[in-house]
Amino acid sequence: MKRLLVFFTALLMFATTMSAGGKLTVRDITGSKFSAKMVQGMNPIAGTDTYARIEGKKIVSYSFKTGKQVGVLFDADNTLGKKIDGFDSYSFSPDGKRMLIQTKTERIYRRSYKAVFYIYNIASRRLDPLSDGGPQQIPTWSEDGQQVAFVRDNNIFLVKLLYDNAEIQVTKDGKFNEVINGLPDWVNEEELGFNKALTFNADGTMLCWLRYDESKVKTYSLQMYKGLAPENEEYADYPGEYSYKYPKAGHDNSVVSAWSYDIKSHKINRLQVPMDADGYMPRIKMTDDPTRIIIYTMNRHQDQLCLYSVNPRTTVAQLIIKEEVPKYVKEEAMENIRFIGNNILLPSDRSGYMNLYVYNMNGQLQRTIGGNFDITAVYGYDAKTGDVYYQAAALGATDRQIYVSHKNGKTVRLTDKEGWNTAVFSGDYQYFVNTWSDYN
């Protein structure tokens, strides 16, 4: 592991300003004058020692090793095919050869949004619309980068890049306030912290998703006014209403189920995942094994999380991990579960502290990382070495340090200054950028 390459120090200079006779204004405090200096928007490129970031209308790559620019990956003013004025965000295909360019983003709820997406080929500089049928939600790459699935109007669609971006409609029963395919309903998004319920299997031959039937959930209405952001001119004279399904305590939730679609035969099957009648399915995830996807289930009390390994072709589910905690399974624990190779990284506070438990794909515990302190972030797992990189509060509640836990059980602290350390690792785990601050 190469040592720390770039070290950013964030110090607030209030004392210096005042001792120099400077006048402290409200604008100084609320503006950027005393903001910490850091590199923002770093997006590590998988398997490399480079990262990408947005700079105006461009996406530019930089070297972790030198900090110097490597190249321009995307320039909105220099594309072939479709032309766009700008963009809001982007994501790489798993093979790094293409990008999804996100434009015209419209927020829906706290985590959900719809946008107009474009497929960009980095080598040819060609930009093509993902779909001409209207804005899309949660576009999801297949692992080979040759397919993209997305949701529109509560239905799932599939785009095949090798077939001139041919578009197939996978589901047809989606309907607002009745059935949702591939997206969580409002209460699952809000309370369980996710906005995507759709994944390919590892070889891209199957598409799997969660389906929410909210037809029996009672409706709640909100008044809408012109003054909302963005402004609604249609409500200038009279307020309107937005009605959606909102299950209050003691009332029916959506009925959730899991499904798979064979991309070659177009056959759709329901996956046989056991679940309590009033329980939840808070995640669906891909693994590196084409015969396995992982589906989470949770009881209504939310103190029991089950991980099922499901074969998307046979539809058979097998319980591999049953996680029980004294109070409730934390949202950040669910979000930080990783499936890499034959390993499952599971954060849990079952001991009273948030530690990291490493299982194999059969649910057998291999090792425990942590101690009498909380692991506060999981940065990644190097499949080549078995090293796990994480942030922890091992020195105290107001301190964060970066660590690596080796496969042999040895743990090494990678940061040497007490305070608050936050890391961004390169895709090959050879470098990381550390952002540091303290209260002085």
List the predicted regions and their residue ranges.
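Predominantly five- to eight-bladed beta-propeller fold
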Residues: S32, K104-Y109, Y113-V116, A166-L198, ...
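Structural motif
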Residues: K57-Y62, Y109-V116, D153-V159, K216-L222, ...
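Non-catalytic accessory segments flanking enzyme active sites
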Residues: V39-N43, T50-S61, G71-L73, D88, ...
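Short glycine-/Asp-/Thr-/Trp-enriched loop segments that recur within the blades
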Residues: K33-M38, T79-G86, N177-G193, D276-M281, ...
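Blade-loop segments of beta-propeller domains
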Residues: K68-E106, L127-Q137, E324-K327
